[in-house]
Amino acid sequence: MSGTLRTVRRPWAIAALVVAVVSLGACSSDDDGGAAALTWYINPDNGGQKTLAAECSEASDGAYRITTQILPNEADSQREQLVRRLAAGDTSVDLMSLDPPFVAEFANAGYLMPVTDEQDVAALTEGVLDGPMETATWDGELVATPFWANTQLLWYRKSVAQAAGVDPTAEDFTWDRMIDAAESQEKRIGVQGRRYEGYMVWINALVASGGGEIIRDTEAGVDAIPSMASPAGDAAADVVGGLARSPAAPGDMATAGEEEARSLFQSDSGSFMVNWPYVYGAASSAVDDGSLDASVFEDIGWARYPRIDAGRASAPPLGGINLAVGAFSEHQDEALDAVKCITSVENNAQYMVEAGNPAARSAAYDDPAVREAFPMADLIRESIDEAAPRPITPYYGDVSTSVQRTWHPSTSVRAPSTPERTDTYMSEVLHGERLL
């Protein structure tokens, strides 16, 4: 990730951006018989958001018409494009699909419309799971609505676990036991070790599972306190560095993302993997198209994210997408109504089945179609509800990049030196003493 909003508040930059987007106002004109023309900036998916846009437009009975604009694939590139538009006061940004870690940054800059009406707040938050709800507020106000949420599960090959004599579904199953089990069977563990946001997701989950925080007192802005140098940070470093230097580490750990981990897990070397629920549907589709043997799919089991300490429940990763209304939209009332439609329980369930992205509202997991598509629906719901968000700070980009740079490559990670180095590095970045 490239810095924070501090880099886009310079008058010369904003002036240039205004010129670049001055012609976009027409995108929000009412040109459909009085219907408000809304533009929804979406992250790439399989077309599910475009479908919801059409269905909610139809259901509005002429009140609004939603057009979607696709953002880049990478989260940091999505952020960059939205920042450029919003810094220029672009009125075409009526709705945006926003990665949860960026909500605080955007809200702090005044780019998101706060929801203040009590009835609106109730409609947008009723039944939303606790994990994603933590990411939707800033400074005591609701500034975004969880659209879909995500979490990582522990995926395991039943045959490997049985041969190693371990039960990954046991409440006290830890990273150490998992590494030992994989080593005993000469197998490899799939993780996300590339220097990117997925690596930050893993590290944050480990620190949170140990009862710690990467940074605390985030409401203090640049004066927040980096707190990796702690028992929880040391325990996280022991897991990351210990796995990286063990025989259970994949050969491509330093460059592995979600797909590399999935490929390893489905191979003869696979044993355990932490990854998002999409991997289950991907494996099923691979069987259907003949690229994966059915016996491999039948060998896949799932459990809650592994523990750091046998006596402390894990804090699974939290991902997903929040919806926010642009602060400069000329159709904020209609945009808010559209958010209510898009994030309804019914549409949460539909999107989970069709796009494979888990719902943010608890009731969606009781939908028969969801339960058929996701046999582990209850576990996903529990994991999202008890997940730990990444640091909620307007300077998230600086925080995440500081962690990624000081913890990579994973073979170099050791306690207590790595967490201590991270705290120093992060503090220098936040106070402008070091450039990213």
Model-derived regions: residue spans:
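C-terminal lobe and pocket-closing loops
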Residues: Y278-V296, I308-T406
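Extracytoplasmic/periplasmic solute-binding protein
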Residues: V143-F147, Q152, D176-A229
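Hinge/lid segment of periplasmic solute-binding proteins
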Residues: P100-T151, S209, F297, G301-A303, ...
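Conserved N-terminal structural module of periplasmic/extracytoplasmic solute-binding proteins
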Residues: S2-A104, V121, E428-L436
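A structural signal for short loop-to-beta-strand junctions that line the ligand-binding cleft
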Residues: V83-R85, S92-D94, L124-V160, G311-A315, ...
